[in-house]
Structure formats: structure tokens, C-alpha cells
Amino acid sequence: MKSINKKQLTNCIKIFLVSVFFFSCNSEKLVEKKIDNVKYVDPQIGGVAPFLQPTRTRIHLPNSMVRMYPERDDYRDDQITSFPLTTRKHRSDLLFNIMPVSGDLPENEAPISAWDQELEIAHPYYFSTWLEDYDITVEFTPAAQAGLFRFNYQNDETRNLYLRNLSGDNWFLNSDGSLTGSEIFEGMKAYVYAKIDSLNIISKGIIKRDTINSWISWGNNKPKKIQ
């Protein structure tokens, strides 16, 4: 068998290293081509319409059931009244509206808060905004058939979660800490099932109702985050 001298071995190693480097460069290019085009979608485009209805800041993954946007007239509106768990049309008719609130509100008064356009983040896969009146940061992430809200309370006021009264079966707090309810519209019925944090937190909350609102209040228990 013919032996390989030192010079030939060195050349082989160089060729191998060049091949590995070339493969690594090509691999990086392949990874770059797999970037999801959703990252280029800006939900804020079309938020102001001079003549027709504006588009909404919709947080919605392609081909998914959950569509959320903050309830306000359009992008110029400086106040938010609630966040729906989903919508039944592309720009209206919200379902299962909720709103985090810090501190106490008078009975029969729906919450409303100013927001800061410069602090809002909106992508099809993630949303975040700051409620100035309540000092709460709201985060939302959609999935195909569900969504996750996270409410970050920044002050030491009482933690409340406003639940807009439903057109069907009202909100019900189950013994396992889950929330259920239904909405009726155009001869159809939508259902909601929600879990809030963990049982040891939600079991300390109660649902209070007035003529237009339902509330979950944590009283003296003040978790920094509720989701």
C-alpha cells in the first residue's frame, strides 16, 4: 500500500476544511430562506381611513381562529375600552371582552384607559400596550384555536379583571378556577373556556356583577401578573 506523505496529508486537511466552510455558508443561506414571512406583516397599516372603515390592529396568525384587536374607534383614538378574546368579523363584532383594571371603579361604569402609541407593539404573533390610567402592561399571543393574555400590574392598587356581560350565558367561575361563558349572535352561539393563572390564585377571587359588568377581584391578594 502506498503511504501518504506529510505534504499530501496537509493538502487533504486544507481541502476538507474548505469543504466544511463552504457547506456552512450554504447552510446559513438555507436557514435564511426559511424565515417566516409573517415577520414582515405590519397590523398597524390602514389604521386610519378618510372615507371607509379603517382596518384594525389585528393580532391574527394565518389560517387560525383567534383574532384579537384592542377596542377603539381607530388608530387615532386615544382610549381603549376592552380586549376581546376573539372577533366574528374581520373588523367588528367583538366576543368575550375583558379589561384589566387597578383600583376600584363605581358600579355600572365600564372601564376605559388612555394608551401610548409609541409604546404599543403589534405583530401577527404578539401584541403589547400600556394602559396609562391603570398602569398595566397588556400582552397577548394568539395560537390556532386559543390565545394567551398577560396583565402586568405596575402599582399596588387592587387587582380587578373586568368581564363585559355576555349576550348568552353569563360568565361563570367554576370550582377548578376556570371561566366559562357563551355569546349568541345571528342565530349562532360561541363558547369560551378560560384558565386564569393557577387555582390557588383564582380561588381567592370572586365574580361580582352589576347591571352591565362582571368583575373578578383579587381583593388584598395582589399578584403582579395575571394570565
Q: What are these regions, as identified by a protein language model?
A:
Residues 1-10:
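N-terminal secretory signal peptides that target proteins for export/translocation
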